């Protein structure tokens, strides 16, 4: 659900960056060595903002080799690195719950927890993604209600050192 292109080396990232000029280039997530990947993204494509899935893409969902605890440790280390770059972070956790049939409360709570952790790790700009029509049975008023609740809770964390930008996007489901 979501696709992607396998890129196998820093040289391939550099090649993509060079042929993409002047477009913005970014990447989504990895399944292991997350801190090292974040550094590669900075060095090769000058990533505009980082995206992390925190506790997905591991043994829990069958998409990676790590256990959940190790995945979280790697992501927390990566968040500290991202904070040092002063780049935004997009924690794209909620829609992964939605893909797996979770309700809107789980969606909203996971967004809030990811935002709170991001702030604690020193992230200054959070990109709050809200994937609409996920699951596909939702639409319109339901999406607006979910967005408003999520935005109200997460924006409550804002201060002079932490800003939240809403990124609504079409669903992939």
Where are these regions (language model features)?
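Catalytic alpha/beta active-site cores
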Residues: 1-115, 119-125, 129-131
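Short, surface-exposed basic-aromatic patches at helix termini and helix-loop junctions that form
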Residues: 40-44, 145-149, 159
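Flexible, glycine- and charge-enriched loops at secondary-structure boundaries
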Residues: 68, 104, 140-147
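Generic multipass alpha-helical transmembrane bundles of integral membrane proteins
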Residues: 132-143, 164
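Conserved, mostly hydrophobic/aromatic
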Residues: 154
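Flexible, glycine/charged-enriched surface loops at secondary-structure junctions
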Residues: 158-166
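Extended amphipathic alpha-helical segments with heptad-repeat/coiled-coil character used for oligomerization
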Residues: 168-173
């Amino acid at each position: 659900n979501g696709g992607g292109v396998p890129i196998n080396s820093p040289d391939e990232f550099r090649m993509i960056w060079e042929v993409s000029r002047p477009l913005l280039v970014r990447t989504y997530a990895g399944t292991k060595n997350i801190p090292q990947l974040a550094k590669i993204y900075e060095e090769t494509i000058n990533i505009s903002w980082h995206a992390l899935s925190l506790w997905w893409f591991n043994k829990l969902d069958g998409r990676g080799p790590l256990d959940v605890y190790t995945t979280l440790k790697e992501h927390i280390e990566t968040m500290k690195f991202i904070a040092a770059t002063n780049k935004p972070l997009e924690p794209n956790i909620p829609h992964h719950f939605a893909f797996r049939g979770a309700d809107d409360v789980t969606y909203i709570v996971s967004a809030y927890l990811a935002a709170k952790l991001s702030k604690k790790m020193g992230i200054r700009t959070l990109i709050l993604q809200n994937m609409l029509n996920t699951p596909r049975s939702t639409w319109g008023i339901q999406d607006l209600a979910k967005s408003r609740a999520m935005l109200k809770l997460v924006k409550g964390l804002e201060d002079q050192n932490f800003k939240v930008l809403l990124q609504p996007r079409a669903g992939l489901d």
